[in-house]
């Protein structure tokens, strides 16, 4: 799904996977996930079908955001808990929409222009920022509401994109 902002000062593209993203987490103090599987997903992307992977470490736990293909490749562990919900990742892109281009300062204003209308409708989002782009994850079950809410401010184009 792609959205072009009418007043956002740039282009906002979103990428979603038909199967969505999963959010497994493991308590940091008892994490026994096999590092081999995580290293494969994170660094050996040519050896995996996973196209979206994020690992976040906090003092309390490790959180992994991974697409369905990557989720199936994760090692099993009794210490790994998985969120029941499936999330769709929307990618915020400014300007020409190239994933490899560097983003200008003020990207958060574009992300805010997407998040604010969703918050006004009580639609939950999960924000993930990287150096080059911002991802807004929405619950798969909320997609019709997200589309309806954003269609008043954005032109929505459906597409399948690769990361």
From Swiss-Prot:
Family statement drawn from the similarity comment of this UniProt entry: Belongs to the GATS family.
Any one Gene Ontology cellular component term annotated for this protein: cytosol
One BP term from GO: cellular response to L-arginine
Protein name: Putative protein CASTOR3P
SUPFAM superfamilies: ACT-like (SSF55021)
Source domain of life: Eukaryota
């Amino acid at each position: 799904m792609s959205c072009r902002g009418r007043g956002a000062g740039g282009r906002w593209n979103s990428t979603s996977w038909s199967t969505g993203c999963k959010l497994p987490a493991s308590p940091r103090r008892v994490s026994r996930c096999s590092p081999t599987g995580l290293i494969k997903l994170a660094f050996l992307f040519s050896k995996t079908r996973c196209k979206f992977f994020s690992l976040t470490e906090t003092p309390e736990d490790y959180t992994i955001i991974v697409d369905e293909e990557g989720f199936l490749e994760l090692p099993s562990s009794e210490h790994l808990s998985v969120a029941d919900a499936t999330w769709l990742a929307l990618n915020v892109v400014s300007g020409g929409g190239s994933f490899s281009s560097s983003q200008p300062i003020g990207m958060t204003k574009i992300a805010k222009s997407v998040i604010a209308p969703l918050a006004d409708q009580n639609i939950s989002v999960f924000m993930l920022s990287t150096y080059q782009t911002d991802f807004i994850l929405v619950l798969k079950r909320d997609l019709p509401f997200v589309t309806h809410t954003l269609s008043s401010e954005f032109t929505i184009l459906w597409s399948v994109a690769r990361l």
